[in-house]
Design a protein with these regions (language model features):
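Short linear interaction motifs
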Residues: 169-171, 280, 285-291
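Surface-exposed beta-loop-beta
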Residues: 262, 267-273, 287
């Protein structure tokens, strides 16, 4: 019973309806034109459909976070988040004991795969200030072989990953940032996959071995090659051999899915920002930015029943001249809306 549809403060007037239960089919208030040659005029248009009973509430794609009374603080359970202490055991022990874990701001060093239970929720509030990180050449993620995830979801669970950055470094050749196999009701939100030549940290000072040679332009593309890392990348075109040497940053597989919102996956060290394969679970992407890869920003293989909204790819001139924005194979029932694919103006070759 809401008879007043809208109330206008400036005019102290309102738009109302006589119906007790109704659906608004059209509402417009302000300067309007009936067609391209009509004179504009201020008016209010309201079209309501009376109903006999309230409709069934729509199912939300975006779940609410658990109440804070259920949260446990990861620091209180022994994790340091100082980017020096190996926090793997403290984090895994917390996951094994508790469902909802608050991860305070800090950089948490990890040396083995973290595995979520079916009910695990990991909650941070800043995907750069709060990171799970690999040190360079971490043994469990190095050498040759099958992909090894820094963080692995449960299979078919209701996992949540919120507000946490994932950093697999530059020289961890088997690394995957997140392997996601959780179910339709799972949720990943506000996650940054760290790496490449973009970042928010203060650049490290150059060592004497990395100083410019006589006649070399400071800051130019012809700078001396350096050992790369996400905190101090080689920015010159073609000079960073660490690019494109890892597996995918975000891997959705094994019938995994859910809702993915506000994801920034731009690690140049990964082969793809997103790889989805072998899943028919109905899933949604809301606002994902994929940038700065060498071979492809996103790849879909044997995927069905996905809605991909506000998907943005970007190829950079330094590493992305040969990069494809999206590769698809064996896919069905995939919806793209508000898709935005672009290459920076500095790229001098077409797709």
């Amino acid at each position: 019973n809401v008879p007043v549809v809208a109330k206008y403060r400036r005019s102290s007037t309102s738009t109302s309806t006589e119906h007790t239960i109704y659906r608004i089919k059209e509402y417009a208030h302000g300067l309007q034109m009936d067609d391209m040659v009509a004179l504009p005029e201020y008016c209010t248009r309201l079209d309501v459909e009376p109903l006999q009973k309230l409709p069934v509430a729509a199912v939300r794609d975006i779940p609410a976070l658990p109440p804070m009374s259920e949260w446990v603080n990861l620091r209180d359970l022994g994790a340091k988040g100082d980017d020096m202490t190996d926090d793997t055991k403290a984090i895994q022990d917390a996951i094994d004991q508790y469902d909802v874990i608050y991860v305070p701001q800090g950089w948490y060093k990890v040396s083995k795969t973290l595995r979520m239970r079916s009910t695990t929720k990991l909650i941070g509030f800043h995907p750069f200030g709060t990171q799970f990180r690999l040190a360079e050449s971490t043994p469990a993620f190095s050498g040759f072989g099958a992909p090894e995830a820094l963080l692995e979801s449960s299979v078919g669970g209701t996992n949540i990953l919120n507000g946490i950055g994932i950093n697999t470094g530059a020289y961890n050749y088997r690394a995957v940032g997140v392997k996601w196999m959780a179910g339709q009701a799972s949720y990943m939100n506000d996650v940054k996959f760290v790496g490449g030549h973009g970042g928010m940290n203060k650049p490290q000072a150059r060592s004497s071995a990395n100083q410019q040679t006589p006649g070399q332009n400071v800051g130019a593309r012809q700078q001396t090659p350096r050992i790369s890392s996400p905190t101090n990348p080689v920015a010159a075109q073609g000079m960073d051999l660490a690019w494109d040497n890892q597996y995918w940053s975000l891997w959705v597989t094994n019938n995994g899915g859910g809702t993915f919102k506000d994801i920034w996956t731009a690690s140049t060290y990964a082969s793809h920002g997103l790889y989805v394969n072998n899943t028919r679970t109905p899933s949604r992407i809301y606002a994902m930015s994929l940038e700065h890869h060498v071979r492809a920003e996103a790849r879909f293989k044997n995927v069905e029943n996905w809605k991909i909204l506000c998907f943005q790819t970007e190829e950079e001139s330094r590493e992305g001249t040969q990069c494809q924005p999206i590769e698809m194979e064996g896919c069905r029932n995939i919806l793209f809306a508000n898709l935005y694919m672009f290459r920076v103006i500095r790229i001098n070759e077409p797709y």
